[in-house]
Amino acid sequence: MLYEAVQGLNITPVGIYVDVTFGGGGHSKEIINHLSADGRLFAFDQDQEAFENQLEDHRFHLIEGNFSDIKRHLKFHGITAVDGILADFGVSSSQFDSGKRGFSTRFDGPLDMRMSHSGQLDASQVINEYPFEAVSYTHLRAHE
């Protein structure tokens, strides 16, 4: 799916693109391969572990934060329009491959489930401290 997703962007070599879910960097690496020296790629991730995958390339800018702030961050960089946006929503496979984040069903670990460690509320607090009705309502809303 990586190549198909990037192909769907119909990349212009001098274009400006955004990967709003950087994660392991696979999509961003493929986008960079299609850009000329004048093309630019901005990527977002709120998971600090994603920064271990940062690309060392003058055309690439990794922004720590949620893509909901895309307009503000791009404006800061002088960008008012982009040629394409890629979003691969969901949990990163690296978050499933370890028990330490609380997403894995294969490994024991804390019930955390935060996309960013900077978030103050983790899943354990919700399960153990919220009233049953609130947790039930949250679960039902997620499955509508």
Provide a role label for each language-model segment:
Residues 5, 21, 88:
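Residue-level signature of catalytic and energy-coupling elements of molecular machines
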Residues 12-14, 38, 80-82:
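A general structural motif
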Residues 74-84:
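A short acidic, Gly/Pro-enriched loop at the edge of an enzyme's catalytic core
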